[in-house]
């Protein structure tokens, strides 16, 4: 049994109502519930946290090094394009991570094309709406089974 950490960045608490044509109508609570259930069915525990504050996400990443977290799944949202702090935190704890995006940032405004995390992530899954999270979790579960 592995402990997994799912982090959601700024404004993702508004999922379901914020720009549904871009992000869909599925709420964050619905995404989290489905992923917690899927992780549990695979014999793992998934812990979820959403924050609009960069330092809260950084502190949770730091805590992951000591609390038995095996893998981090992260949708950094707008912090993707700005946060050296998240990058440094992820590198500092040395845990594998997957970067997730609901939309395809490469098909959007040019300022969204750069990620401070992608080159260090085990993988990046984007553009599949709420399914991006499910696909990321399935990839992590497969990786854990392969490495067991």
UniProtKB/Swiss-Prot annotation:
Gene3D superfamilies (alphabetical): Dehydroquinase, class II
Record-marked site positions (Transition state stabilizer): 18
Pfam family for this entry, one: DHquinase_II
Reactions that this protein is recorded to catalyse: 3-dehydroquinate = 3-dehydroshikimate + H2O
Catalytic residues (positions): 23, 101
UniProt keyword Lyase, yes or no: yes
One MF annotation (Gene Ontology) recorded for this entry: 3-dehydroquinate dehydratase activity
Binding site residues for substrate: 75, 81, 88, 102-103, 112
GO biological process per UniProt: amino acid biosynthetic process; aromatic amino acid family biosynthetic process; chorismate biosynthetic process; quinate catabolic process
Pathway participation: Metabolic intermediate biosynthesis; chorismate biosynthesis; chorismate from D-erythrose 4-phosphate and phosphoenolpyruvate: step 3/7
EC identifiers of the protein: 4.2.1.10
UniProt xrefs under InterPro entries: DHquinase_II, DHquinase_II_CS, DHquinase_II_sf
Alphabetically ordered keywords of this record: Amino-acid biosynthesis, Aromatic amino acid biosynthesis, Lyase
EC main group: lyase
SUPFAM superfamilies: Type II 3-dehydroquinate dehydratase (SSF52304)
Subunit structure: Homododecamer.
UniProt family annotation: Belongs to the type-II 3-dehydroquinase family.
Role: Catalyzes a trans-dehydration via an enolate intermediate.
Protein's UniProt name: 3-dehydroquinate dehydratase
Originating species: Xanthomonas euvesicatoria pv. vesicatoria (strain 85-10) (Xanthomonas campestris pv. vesicatoria)
